[in-house]
């Protein structure tokens, strides 16, 4: 038996072998665009699975998917060993189907520690009736206020889920300021009596983030902002807007459910430190 992890073009032809509920949309999208991060898992030169490897300085993200006809034969374990040899980072983050207990235990048995999970949700309804709120496009002079409210809101969320014990507030920087300015056309702020109380951004079909200033939460502003931003995506021609909700973020999940967003799939993340 010779399991190898190799580059191969046109991996999208293997998409019919992939279970969407297991792999999730992102892996399939990477296969469709023939991403540089996609590799074939081969057995004696025959493709028996695929893997996604994004090896960055702060951690390597991987997904391993063995086609069903080749499972329960030890090929997944051998493939994971080969993938780990390729990783240069000191930490590996394995992505798996959160509701797939077999996949979770497969990783745990090999030294990975499940840390957190996130659910992709999709909306396929009509435009919302939105309360009278003041929303405008983000401007550079908004940076300090918008950054501070978004950073604190997400820090509180991370701590609240119990999945991010090392979460800390970030500091504003010129680098992040320029990055925000670069994508200003996709960023929006909500104002109340001249004060910035909300920030949101979109990317393609996705409502990427929505955050409300801590002092103004639990007043219905978040729900109204989500309605407004969903409508913006629909106005851009997006037929089914999507968003992600961290598992354990109970308040946000309740809002999304009440608005008609439906769970599509849920991905889990498991970490392992390497010896490098």
What is each model feature region?
Residues 62, 92-97, 207, 241-245:
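Conserved hydrophobic beta-strand within the GNAT/NAT acetyltransferase core sheet
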Residues 8-31, 155-177:
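Conserved GNAT-fold acetyl-CoA-binding loop/helix
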Residues 49, 116-117, 198, 222, ...:
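A structural microfeature
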Residues 71-133, 270-271:
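Acyl-donor-binding surface of acyltransferase catalytic domains
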Residues 25-78, 197-208:
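Conserved donor-binding loop and adjoining core beta-sheet/short helix segment
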Residues 1-14, 134-159:
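A short beta-loop-alpha structural element at the N-terminal edge
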Residues 72-86, 212, 218-232, 254, ...:
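Conserved acetyl-CoA-binding loop-helix of GNAT-fold acetyltransferases
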Residues 116-141, 242-250, 262, 266-276:
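C-terminal "cap" of GNAT-fold acetyltransferases
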């Amino acid at each position: 038996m010779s399991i190898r992890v190799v580059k191969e073009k046109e991996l999208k032809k293997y998409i019919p072998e992939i279970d969407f509920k297991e792999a999730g949309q992102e892996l399939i999208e990477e296969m469709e665009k023939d991403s540089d991060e996609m590799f074939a898992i081969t057995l004696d030169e025959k493709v028996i699975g695929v893997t996604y490897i994004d090896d960055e300085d702060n951690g390597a993200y991987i997904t391993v998917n063995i086609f069903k006809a080749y499972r329960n034969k030890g090929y997944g374990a051998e493939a994971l060993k080969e993938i780990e040899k390729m990783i240069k980072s000191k930490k590996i983050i394995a992505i798996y189907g959160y509701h797939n207990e077999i996949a979770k235990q497969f990783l745990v048995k090999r030294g990975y520690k499940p840390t957190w999970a996130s659910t992709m949700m999709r909306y396929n309804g009509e435009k919302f009736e939105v309360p009278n709120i003041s929303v405008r496009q983000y401007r550079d002079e908004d940076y300090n206020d918008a950054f501070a409210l978004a950073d604190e809101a997400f820090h509180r969320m991370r701590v609240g889920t119990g999945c991010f014990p090392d979460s800390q507030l970030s500091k504003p920087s010129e680098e992040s300021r320029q990055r925000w300015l670069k994508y200003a056309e996709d960023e929006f702020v909500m104002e109340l009596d001249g004060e910035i109380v909300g920030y949101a951004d979109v990317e393609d079909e996705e409502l990427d983030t929505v955050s409300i200033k801590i002092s103004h939460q639990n007043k219905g502003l978040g729900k109204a902002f989500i309605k407004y931003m969903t409508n913006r995506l629909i106005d851009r021609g997006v037929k089914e807007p999507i968003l992600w909700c961290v598992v354990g973020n109970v308040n946000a999940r309740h809002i999304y459910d009440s608005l008609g967003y439906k769970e599509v799939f849920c991905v889990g993340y498991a970490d392992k430190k390497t010896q490098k």
